[in-house]
């Protein structure tokens, strides 16, 4: 039996001059083949006998494309749409003052959907202390915690030794950073996320003027702030982040529920960019 590994909706083979063909439904799966044929016209055919869910590591998933984090997810339904489209991270707002805030029980349901689809559930915290964040992360089965406000960021040096952390830096409209990450602990964070001054507002900042600080995390950095299907290609081309974060840019008319067509358009735009 010959075996291939499917990532990013295509099957990789150890052959030269083999063009990749996208197949829906095979994202993040190990695929076994019962028959593989190679004809003289260099066409290869195969029959799939079995597929198995796998969850690639962050650094593996981002090798041929920027990672995608879809945030402000408020239901298992929206999480399923995001995962099916190819999101790598599913973000949830655990902050009562956000219109996209959810309960811990709903967050747990979303985490389940995310994990089953090979994505990582992320909880966004703003003003919570260390103990509150840890309890919420355990209760909701979060993979990462995102520290967005000064209150939550104050617990970073302690949390980063207990949980996988996304640390948020905010930039004003001119692209100037408004806060810093503790340099002595920055390397312990999984990701640095650069957002606009008001996250989830749909407002961005000047990408051309922005300068990424010299501090580095384990995996790299994510870009957020005013990202949508029409401008994500430009944002990626200018700044070339390791991943992109979208929230309001894929929402429907109510600004809360996600729009399937916008999600699809967003993913298509991201996949059109190659560094």
UniProtKB/Swiss-Prot annotation:
Expressed in roots and shoots. GO terms for biological process: L-tryptophan biosynthetic process. Pathway: Amino-acid biosynthesis; L-tryptophan biosynthesis; L-tryptophan from chorismate: step 3/5. It is an enzyme of class 5 (isomerase). GO terms for cellular component: chloroplast. Keywords: Amino-acid biosynthesis, Aromatic amino acid biosynthesis, Chloroplast, Isomerase, Plastid, Transit peptide, Tryptophan biosynthesis. The keyword Isomerase applies. Its EC number is 5.3.1.24. Residues 1-32 form a transit peptide. One of its GO terms (molecular function) is phosphoribosylanthranilate isomerase activity. Disruption phenotype: Bushy morphology, reduced fertility, blue fluorescence under UV light and resistance to the anthranilate analog 6-methylanthranilate. It is found in: Plastid, Chloroplast. Pfam families: PRAI. Its main location: plastid. InterPro entries: Aldolase_TIM (IPR013785), PRAI_dom (IPR001240), RibuloseP-bd_barrel (IPR011060), TrpF_fam (IPR044643). SUPFAM superfamilies: Ribulose-phoshate binding barrel. Catalyzes the conversion of 5-phosphoribosylanthranilate to l-(O-carboxyphenylamino)-l-deoxyribulose-5-phosphate, which is the third step of the tryptophan biosynthetic pathway. Belongs to the TrpF family. This is N-(5'-phosphoribosyl)anthranilate isomerase 1, chloroplastic. The lineage of its organism: Eukaryota, Viridiplantae, Streptophyta, Embryophyta, Tracheophyta.
């Amino acid at each position: 039996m010959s075996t291939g590994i499917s990532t990013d909706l295509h099957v990789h083979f150890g052959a030269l001059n083999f063009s990749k063909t996208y197949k829906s439904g095979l994202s993040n799966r190990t695929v076994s083949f019962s028959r593989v044929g190679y004809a003289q016209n260099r066409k290869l055919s195969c029959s799939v006998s079995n597929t198995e869910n796998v969850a690639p590591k962050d650094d593996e998933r981002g090798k041929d494309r920027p990672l995608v984090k879809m945030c402000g997810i408020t239901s298992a339904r929206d999480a399923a749409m995001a995962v099916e489209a190819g999101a790598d991270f599913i973000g949830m707002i655990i902050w009562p003052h956000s219109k996209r805030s959810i309960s811990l029980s709903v967050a747990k349901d979303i985490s389940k959907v995310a994990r089953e689809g090979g994505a990582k559930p992320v909880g966004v915290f703003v003003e919570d202390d260390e103990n509150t964040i840890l309890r919420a992360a355990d209760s909701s089965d979060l993979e990462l915690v995102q520290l967005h406000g000064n209150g939550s960021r104050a617990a970073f040096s302690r949390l980063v030794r207990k949980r996988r952390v996304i640390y948020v830096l905010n930039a004003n409209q001119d692209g100037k950073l408004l806060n810093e990450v503790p340099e002595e602990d920055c390397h312990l964070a999984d990701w640095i996320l650069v957002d606009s001054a008001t996250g989830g507002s749909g407002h961005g900042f000047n990408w051309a003027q922005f300068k990424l600080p010299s501090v580095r995390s384990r995996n790299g950095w994510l870009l957020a702030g005013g990202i949508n299907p029409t401008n994500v290609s430009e944002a990626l081309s200018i700044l070339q982040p390791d991943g992109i974060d979208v929230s309001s840019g894929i929402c429907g008319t109510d600004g809360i529920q996600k729009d399937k067509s916008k999600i699809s358009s967003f993913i298509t735009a991201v996949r059109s960019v190659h560094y």
